[in-house]
Amino acid sequence: MSNWRHKLWRKLSSFQRASYSTTSSRNNKLKLDDLRKLRPMILKRIENRAKDYPVKEIVPVAEEILIARKNLISNIAALLKVFPVLTCKFCSEVFVGKEGHLIETCRSYIRRGNNRLHEWVPGSINDILVPVESYHLHNISQGVIRHQERFDYDRVPAILELCCQAGAIHPEEILQYSEIHDNPQISEEDIRSLPAGDLKYVGANALMAWEKVRAGVKKLLLVYPSKVCKRCKEVHVGPSGHKARLCGVFKYESWRGTHYWEKAGVNDLVPEKMVWHRRPQDPVVLVDEGRSYYGHAPAIVSLCSHTGAIVPVKYACKMKPQGLSFSFTNPVPNLET
């Protein structure tokens, strides 16, 4: 009896697979025919949509973003003259302080093992404000960038490209604007001579500018479409992503080819670089045994909190300002061993 049921089940399953494959192929053919007919209408609609941009009501928002971004870069560059920032030599870990922590979270680029101690080197402003670049489009209705055309277009900061499409920057002046405002010239002697009250004021201004930039980018993304690759986090500011085959270049990445585009968010254009945050009740050097006690914070927030600036309440759940600290009796291990 069981053999008869087995044969009947095989016949039914084979019939179901055959009917399903025939139906799917027929549906795919109908979809391709429909797309060929709709292609001229879609292209015409894209061209007509470009006439509605830039939206005049959104231009002041883009201008406020540029002003806040300029203040943010200058204030962070000034704070880095006083407060040291360290970055790991083998991974992207960042720490705000004179001495790096001893938390074993290094997943190095080279094959030296996971969950090891970090090897700290001096950091820069790019470790605090993570640079995110995208291709600069001549206009919003231009064709998709092909792989062989990837060197014909300039790479600019994604925020500037978003503000350029919003009408705050002229397309031909965006490269010059980036060179002037992204490299502020600040004297180290003038910053070190500032009293503690002025440093607190600089930190508060940096936090305020950071929040303004993120809030403004969130508003612009509601009007101007942007894409991000799900796999490699490549950002493209425009209605459709480019076709430069820059995704999956490593051997362990099996997809190797075009990007997998999805809608971009604020964290894709203005990423929060999360770091371990040392609180006043914590030891001088954070150890691996107390990692469950310590808090996290965006690198900018951690840097500005060292100046005494008031941190927004929304970061309190991650920073654990009133949380318990880990107490240990063993000496700190030597890094040289």
From Swiss-Prot:
Which UniProt keywords are given for this protein, alphabetically ordered? Mitochondrion, Repeat, Transit peptide
Name of the molecule in the record: APO protein 4, mitochondrial
Q: Name one GO cellular component term.
A: mitochondrion
Q: What's this protein's family per the entry?
A: Belongs to the APO family.
Q: Which PROSITE patterns does its entry note?
A: APO (PS51499)
Free-text note on domains in this protein's UniProt record = The APO motifs may provide ligands for 4Fe-4S centers.
The chain's transit peptide is found over 1-20
Q: What Pfam families does this protein map onto?
A: APO_RNA-bind
Q: Name one GO molecular function term.
A: RNA binding
Q: Does the keyword Nucleotide-binding apply?
A: no
Is-annotated flag, keyword Mitochondrion? yes
Q: What does this protein do?
A: May be involved in the stable assembly of several 4Fe-4S cluster-containing complexes of mitochondria.
Chief localisation class: mitochondrion
At the highest ranks, the source species' classification is:
Eukaryota, Viridiplantae, Streptophyta, Embryophyta, Tracheophyta
- Residues of the APO domain: 87-172, 228-313
Under the heading InterPro entries, the entry gives: APO_dom (IPR023342)
> Which compartment or compartments is the protein found in?
Mitochondrion
